[in-house]
Amino acid sequence: MNYITAAIAFFYLSKKILQPKTRVVHNLKKLFTAFGLALISWVCTLATVLIVAAFVSVIGRSLSWYTHFYVSVFLYGTAAAAKLILVHTLAKKLLYKNMNEQYPGDIFFDASLMIWTVALAVITHLGLCSAFICAFWVAFPLLTKLMIHKEFSQKGATMKFVMMYMLGMFVPYLYTMYLSWTVFEMFTPIMGRSGSEIPPDAVLAGLIVVTTIILSSYFINFIYLVKSTKTTLITLAAMFVVTLILVCSGIFFPYSSDEANPKPKRVFLQHVSRRFHDLDGNVVKSDSGIWINGFDYNGISHITPHVPEINDTIRTPCEEQAPFCGLPWILPVHFMFRKNWYLPAPEIVPRNPIHFKVLSKELTPRNSLRLSFEVSGPSHMSLYVRPHEGSALSTWSLGDGTPVASVGGDYFVFYSHGLQASPWHFWVELTAPEKHSHGVVSLAIAAHYFFGEDQKSPQLYALLERLPNWTFSSGWSCTYDLFVF
């Protein structure tokens, strides 16, 4: 059905281009000019809206729409619509000023139909089930065009033409708006925990631009049919400017503790004690503190007024020689959360400490070094492995035996067991150069105390109590030990 729909649309477009045969080249030129203008308008719109999103992010007003979604529509939606209309208004005045208004209106409809038909054919060929959405955007507009062609060619853009046109577009527009709303319902909460490196305003602005382009694809031709777009442009520009001023003023607070519609800021706090050992097993560095992850692009900027000691002066330094920056991650998402904070705190002494033992070091027939370990501790532990320069982790006793590196080249394993379990035994095998005076691998183990009497220290509990009610916090204690072999 998709191929049949695309074939009918291509037949319609071919017939339009070939009438009359003496103007085939001229008709093709006009069609591809309209196609090029559509692409230019999309690029200009995306660039403009992303610049606005970057500005909002730089001034520290990111996620202003997190609780008030309508803000994103008035900020980015109006900017996108205004830019699209402006580009085509300029094209109308510069390229089509001496033409009958019906001609550019007709040619831009055909350009939109061609874009959707090509998309339908390509997506169907790729075997993607979502091709039926493109089929909607080909079949319904084409049927509508055929039904109102006589009315349009004889009388122009009458009220009857507009009403029939809108009615014909009702099904694809309604379904696309439903899908768009579903996408925004999914992505808006995700932006609240997308990390410190991805500007959420840029992501949402991009989604709004794509939605605007799709929904306006068959209405661009109306810009060439109406006498003036001045009133529309002024209205959209005024709405955008007012919204931008309000966003810059900080009137739209990102988070909410409303029980009916909660939009909390997620915060993870881990009271951690760290010990770094050298090649001889001696502790060369140790510290203790509460490690804080803000989870979104705003970091801790909104928390600082409530808890002044949590500020940018305590940004966590990265331990370059340690895997995952020497921090007890529970998931390998360090590349998404490069900005985190480390508040000095007393050392924790768990009642059920971790025990890490080297069982053996042996050379294999393949000239590899195999290290065997025994670990006992709480029910949840993380293992971090970083081969040194010149070394490589070839195999291990975990999973299917094939190590898979995380982003950055380090290896991560999350291990958990029941309340009563025997010690965890595993081995790693590394290929290494003959001379390795500084060791061949750095291996770290973290113990996470998610429950029980070791879960929260008094300092951690006190800090959690001071967080504002619009935060959703998770806190636990953990230890981190780094070894070099």
What are these regions (language model features)?
Residues 272-485:
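Extracytosolic and intramembrane catalytic regions of membrane-associated proteins
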